[in-house]
C-alpha cells in the first residue's frame, strides 16, 4: 500500500522546496497515464497560473519529448490544458470560487492551500468523482501553522489538544 492508494496527499515544506514542481509532475503524469481524465489545479491567482504553473507544466512536457500543438494545447483564455489522449487539466483560482464547480474530476491539486479559505477546499472536494478513475487529491503549500484549518483534517488529535476547549459548568461553591 503506497501513496497512490490514499485519497488525499499533502506536500508541505519551506519556501523554494519544490513542492509545486513535484506536485505538477504528479499532475502531468496522472493526466498522461489515465486517458480522458480530468483534473484541476487551483492557484491563488490567474497571474500565478500564467507565470508559474503553465510554464512549469509546459516545460515538463517539453522535457518529456511532448510537443505543443501535437501532444498538448494550452488554452490561455479558458485556462485549460488539453492532452493528445483526451485528458484535460483545468486551471482555476481561489479568487473566483464561482468557477470551481464544474465537471467531475479524477484528481485535484490546490497549490498554496495555506492562503485559501477552507470553503474553497470543501466546495471542490465533492467534484473528485469522475467515474472509472482512481480519485486523488494532493495539496501543496508551506505549512499553515498550528491554527490553520488544514490541521483539523490531517492532525485532528493534535488540533483538539491544542485548540479545542472543553467548557465545564462550575458547580456552586467551587
Model regions: which residues?
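Phosphate/NTP-binding elements of NTP-utilizing enzymes
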Residues: 1-174
Amino acid at each position: 500500500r503506497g501513496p497512490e492508494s490514499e485519497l488525499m496527499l499533502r506536500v508541505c515544506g519551506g519556501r523554494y522546496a519544490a513542492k509545486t514542481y513535484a506536485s505538477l509532475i504528479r499532475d502531468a503524469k496522472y493526466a498522461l497515464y489515465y486517458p480522458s481524465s480530468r483534473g484541476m489545479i487551483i492557484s491563488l491567482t490567474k497571474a500565478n497560473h500564467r507565470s508559474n504553473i503553465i510554464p512549469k507544466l509546459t516545460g515538463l512536457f517539453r522535457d518529456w519529448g511532448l510537443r505543443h500543438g501535437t501532444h498538448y494545447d494550452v488554452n490561455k483564455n479558458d485556462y485549460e490544458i488539453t492532452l493528445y489522449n483526451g485528458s484535460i487539466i483545468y486551471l482555476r483560482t481561489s479568487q473566483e470560487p464561482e468557477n470551481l464547480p464544474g465537471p467531475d474530476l479524477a484528481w485535484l491539486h490546490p497549490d498554496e492551500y495555506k492562503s485559501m479559505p477552507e470553503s474553497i477546499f470543501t466546495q471542490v472536494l465533492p467534484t473528485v468523482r469522475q467515474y472509472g478513475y482512481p480519485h486523488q487529491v494532493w495539496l501543496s503549500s508551506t505549512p499553515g501553522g498550528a491554527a490553520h484549518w488544514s490541521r483539523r483534517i490531517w492532525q485532528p488529535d493534535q488540533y483538539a489538544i491544542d485548540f479545542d476547549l472543553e467548557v465545564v459548568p462550575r458547580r456552586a461553591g467551587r
